[in-house]
Amino acid sequence: KEIHGNRGKGCPVFVKEWPDPLAETKAITEELRDYHLMGIAYEDMAVLYRTNQGPRLLIERMMEYNIPFHMRDTVPNLYEHWISRNVFCYIYAALGDLSRSNILQIINRPARYISRDALDTKVIRWEQLRSFYQDKNWMLDRIDQLVYDLEMLREMAPAGAVNYIRKAIGYDDYLREYANERRLKPEDLFEVLDALQESAVPFKTYEAWFNHMDEYKEQLKEQSALREAEKEGVSLMTMHSCKGLEFKVVYILDTNEGITPHHKAVLEPDLEEERRMFYVAMTRAKDRLHIFYVKERYHKRQTVSRFVVETGLLGKKGDLEKNGKQGRK
């Protein structure tokens, strides 16, 4: 489908590639603020994304910059996912929470074959646990390794701790086995850990990271309460929810293969519906349209969406934008 504006010649469409989502969301936030300083109301701006999983980083960045926003859709809280809670339980244990309820969340994730019967006190004491397995040297080795791992975690920065839990302790292996037993895709579970690790990067201490999570949770609660109230600030919404609305400035977030079109859309009718949603998203912009995609996500190379290529806005291969530089207009 060829797309033509009906308001005469206006501003060019800006298509940009960013190194990663952190750079992408930082740029969007700064540009929204700049548009506001130019006299455009926040209510006349929108950021659109394919699914409600998309805006977490952007929400966190907008909170940091104190840019008002409202969400049309409910956004799941990454920090309340059961996988995230498992990671937090490791950190809580490293910081001294040896309550039975906390230790039960981690003791066999990954499998250490430690019986619940061995954890029969409200607060777990490692010496008592060793006594329970005193005639099984291989179990004593596992207990000692866990104690060592918790001591290591205590001194780490949050992002390093998440990586240590995944790779050194073996939580990724646990998730892989969990997924295989249930015929799930391990990659879908790893995405939660990737997002969690990405979230931890800006913070040097657990306290700062946990404080940020509390603020994020409160913001989601506030957005939920205000969803039916008067809409103030930048609109954040899925492509599906934006139909019928128009804004002076529109950003389309994460226009990469696997996101738009969604990786689950494989049949031609599904792909056509994805294409239609992308078209709807583009046509929400009255004055300025920005289409953003990333080069790398979670240390994996990404490809620009076929829908962006189909628009012809990328031009020749040599015209592709790199690292946030402006490409063809």
Question: What kind of feature is each model-predicted range?
Answer:
Residues C11, E64-I67, V75-P110:
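Conserved short internal alpha-helix adjacent to the catalytic or cofactor-binding core
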Residues K1-P68, L95:
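Helicase P-loop NTPase motor core
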Residues V123, N256-K329:
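C-terminal accessory regions
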Residues L104-E127:
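Helix-hairpin-helix
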Residues Q134-S241, I259-H262, R288, E321-K329:
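Accessory C-terminal helicase-associated subdomains
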Residues K9-V13, E43, Y65-I67, E232, ...:
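Short glycine-/polar-rich loops that comprise or flank the Walker A/P-loop
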Residues R85-C89, V234-H262:
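A short beta-strand element within the Helicase C-terminal
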